[in-house]
């Protein structure tokens, strides 16, 4: 056969293939949001030769690996790739997929090219939608210039098609060091146990102010008195705290005290807000602490109040009683502590790993466990083939029964991220449901123990990559609470403005995807228009889109730019009419109502008991919003209503979120109209990054800038917990400081962890078709659940 004919055939085949690429519907993390945005009207990826995302790997020939590659999900990624038909191509999208990015941590593969061949790399964190389009055109050029498919198609020797590049080996055929080539001989400064070393540093000799101290209210004093009378020396009140009443409890009386606080105390602390542990083995004042500290945060609704309980444990394999019989929500929290710390809970109904793979060795949040992936053996293609997810049968409570067991996920169009549902079916009816999470676990709490207080801010927005700057607020407020940093009024209102813009953005994405979940595709093509308008405002103000990383300790990174108010006013003018138009598409639609009304019900009492928060809680009839109950950042100065519904079903959750958008717009309008004058960051530069103009005027500001940027500010020794009302619910940060430039313990309480744990309660007795409607109505996001 002549070369001329083969060359012509190569041209025709390459032209056909490069302009008819079929990407797989597959996403790992933040980058997938921008990948999906590339298919919306502003960008319209179809113009560039890539059509609708395909739900099955057997229908796709392009795998865009968008986001962080986790060791737990890596075998699934490999399986999806191997199920794709030849020829097939791979685009690695974003810094995390390319090389691990900012997640050099125990749970993350340092690049997808360690298990798959990669044709095109798209840099960025995350790349913009325009970068996705450029990556696609680069792949098309590669297909046209490098591939000779005719011989393969005609079963002749020679030729090439699809991905042909080799899989790389970390440390052998690619750089092992996360800082890039040429850095292998330079030791990384600092670990979770050892702070960064600066030769000749006298920082330990420097005086720093003590942590903030609060006065107990009369109600809190009464609670302390009652606990002392009831439990005697088994309960000891901590004399000084920065945020809430704190009590140390003897382990053998812990369960009694917790039960009393929930069922008999006045007020009753009905919700277990969080449960976590602290490994005390690396404390500088080691003799003052036990080996471990268990920490319980409780919440009362009437009146609004919080309390913290702590108990000390000793030994390498400590144990204490489970409290799952007091709060069912403790189930996952205790499993997480067992998984990451190795602390056992006696009487727990199912104490097994929850975040890490089932065959993982060790407990990552122990201080002696390596924090960086580059401190561990390189992850290889062989590892991905060996460490497979467990069979769905092990999750069922009746493995020998006659129920049909159905796996949904961990990669599925309707799971809204990397989450695995194991469904037991009696015909079409769901008889039981188990979830396997942890596929998106990227060790952010461990990272918080090595990054300085300022360096950790970029990680916050990535905990919920659709809530943007709203994620930063509970973190910076927790540190500000501990260090008693006063935030200027202008900075507080700017924070509110950005947080509410991201609430609108989040709910617009939810509106579109939820409508799609139940069969209405049209909203997808409309709501992203206003979302892009909101992100344009965010970009105008902060310079970023999804992850501005713009909040700072003591304020925000910069003052508002020229033109910000005009852009916000334009949004305020057009948004109400657009929202009415979108709502008219589905609110009274008989199909939508049939799919959502009476489906996925949960009572108010169950929602409280399981720790549900945000719109999902308010849809059960409880008017609970932290912006009202624990006002922060000046929210007490804004007029807005707290939307509620009483049915507790999918339709009620829809109604609450739609009305929340209207209320957020009211707050945005007030913030823009009444923006106070003044500073955008505090002038107390002991802990914050000084304004550049001040560093040019006086040496004191310049010194603070140098110290706080290099080794980080020395935040006082102590602890603080702050929770904020982000779009999906209550997100809290519990920061523990040991007087150094970074956190000793960084704990994140994500709303999705509790909201998703209740999923079996919502789904039992419903049909399998209704499960998709229930999943979408809860509005969770995986990095918030898995952290």
UniProtKB/Swiss-Prot annotation:
Sequence ranges of Polar residues compositional bias: 191-202
Subcellular location: Cell inner membrane
EC number from the UniProt entry: 7.1.1.-
Spans annotated as NADH dehydrogenase I subunit B: 1-149
Annotated stretches, region: Disordered: 154-205
Coiled-coil region list: none
Signal peptide range in chain numbering: none
Pfam family, one: Oxidored_q6
Top-level EC class as recorded in UniProt: translocase
Record protein name field: NADH-quinone oxidoreductase subunit B/C/D
Gene: nuoBCD
């Amino acid at each position: 056969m002549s070369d001329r004919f083969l060359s012509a055939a190569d041209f025709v085949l390459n032209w056909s293939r490069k302009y008819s690429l079929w990407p797989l519907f597959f996403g790992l993390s933040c980058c997938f949001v921008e990948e999906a945005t590339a298919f919306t009207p502003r960008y319209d990826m179809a113009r560039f030769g890539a059509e609708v995302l395909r739900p099955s790997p057997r229908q796709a020939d392009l795998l865009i690996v968008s986001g962080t590659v986790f060791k737990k999900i890596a075998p699934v990624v490999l399986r999806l790739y191997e199920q794709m038909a030849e020829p097939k191509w791979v685009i690695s999208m974003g810094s995390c997929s390319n090389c691990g990015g900012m997640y050099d941590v125990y749970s993350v593969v340092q690049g997808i090219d360690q298990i798959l061949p990669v044709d095109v790399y798209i840099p960025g964190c995350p790349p913009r939608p325009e970068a996705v389009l450029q990556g696609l055109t680069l792949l098309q050029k590669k297909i046209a210039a490098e591939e000779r498919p005719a011989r393969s198609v005609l079963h002749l020797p020679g030729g090439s098609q699809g991905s042909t590049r080799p899989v790389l080996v970390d440390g052998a055929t690619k750089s092992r060091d996360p800082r890039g080539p040429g850095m292998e001989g330079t030791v990384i400064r600092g670990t979770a146990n050892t702070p960064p070393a600066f030769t000749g540093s006298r920082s330990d000799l420097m005086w720093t102010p003590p942590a903030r101290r609060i006065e107990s209210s009369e109600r809190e004093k009464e609670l302390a008195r009652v606990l002392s009378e009831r439990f005697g020396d088994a309960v000891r009140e901590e004399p000084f705290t920065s945020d809430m009443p704190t009590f140390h409890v003897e382990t053998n009386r812990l369960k009694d005290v917790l039960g009393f606080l929930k069922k008999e105390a006045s007020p009753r602390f009905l919700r277990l807000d969080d449960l976590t542990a602290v490994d005390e083995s690396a404390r500088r004042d080691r003799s003052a602490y036990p080996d471990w500290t268990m920490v319980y945060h409780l919440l009362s609704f009437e009146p609004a109040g919080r309390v913290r309980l702590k108990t000390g444990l000793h030994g390498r394999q400590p144990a204490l009683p489970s409290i799952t019989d007091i709060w069912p929500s403790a189930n996952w929290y205790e499993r997480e502590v067992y998984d990451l710390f190795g602390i056992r809970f006696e009487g727990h109904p199912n104490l097994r790993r929850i975040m890490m793979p089932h065959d993982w060795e060790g407990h990552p949040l122990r201080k002696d466990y390596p924090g960086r992936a580059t401190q561990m053996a390189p992850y290889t293609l062989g590892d991905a083939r060996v460490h497979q997810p467990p069979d769905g049968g092990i999750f069922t409570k009746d493995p020998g029964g006659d129920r049909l067991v159905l796996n949904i996920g961990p990669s599925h169009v309707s799971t809204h991220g990397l989450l695995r549902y194991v469904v037991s079916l009696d015909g079409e009816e769901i008889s039981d449901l188990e979830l396997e999470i942890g596929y998106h676990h990227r060790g952010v709490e461990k990272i918080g123990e090595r990054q300085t207080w300022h360096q950790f801010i970029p990680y916050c927005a990535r905990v919920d990559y659709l809530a943007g700057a709203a994620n930063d607020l509970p973190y910076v407020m927790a540190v500000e609470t501990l260090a008693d940093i006063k935030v200027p009024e202008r900075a507080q209102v700017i924070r509110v403005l950005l947080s509410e813009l991201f609430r609108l953005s989040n709910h617009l994405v939810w509106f579109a995807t939820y409508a799609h979940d139940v069969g209405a595709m049209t909203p997808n093509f409309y709501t992203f228009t206003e979302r892009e308008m909101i992100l344009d405002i965010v970009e105008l103000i902060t310079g970023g889109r999804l992850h501005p990383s713009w909040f700072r300790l003591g304020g925000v990174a910069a003052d508002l730019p020229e033109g910000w108010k005009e852009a916000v006013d334009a949004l305020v003018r057009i948004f109400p009419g657009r929202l009415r138009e979108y709502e008219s598409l589905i609110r009274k639609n008989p199909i939508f109502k049939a799919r959502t009304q009476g489906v996925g019900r949960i009572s108010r009492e169950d929602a409280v008991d399981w720790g549900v928060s945000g719109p999902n809680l308010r849809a059960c009839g409880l008017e609970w919003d932290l912006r009202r109950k624990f006002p922060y950042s000046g929210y007490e100065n804004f007029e807005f209503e707290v939307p509620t519904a009483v049915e507790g079903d999918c339709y009620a959750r829809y109604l609450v979120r739609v009305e929340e958008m209207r209320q957020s717009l009211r707050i945005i309008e007030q913030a823009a109209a009444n923006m106070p004058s003044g500073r955008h960051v505090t002038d107390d530069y002991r802990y914050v990054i000084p304004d550049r103009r001040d560093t040019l005027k006086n040496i004191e500001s310049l010194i603070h800038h140098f110290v706080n940027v290099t080794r980080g500010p020395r935040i006082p020794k102590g602890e603080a917990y702050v929770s904020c009302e982000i779009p999906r619910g209550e997100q809290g940060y519990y920061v523990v400081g040991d007087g150094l430039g970074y956190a000793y313990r960084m704990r994140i309480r994500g709303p999705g962890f509790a909201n998703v744990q209740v999923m079996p309660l919502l789904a039992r007795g419903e049909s399998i078709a209704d499960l998709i409607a229930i999943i979408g109505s809860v509005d969770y996001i995986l990095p918030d659940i898995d952290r």
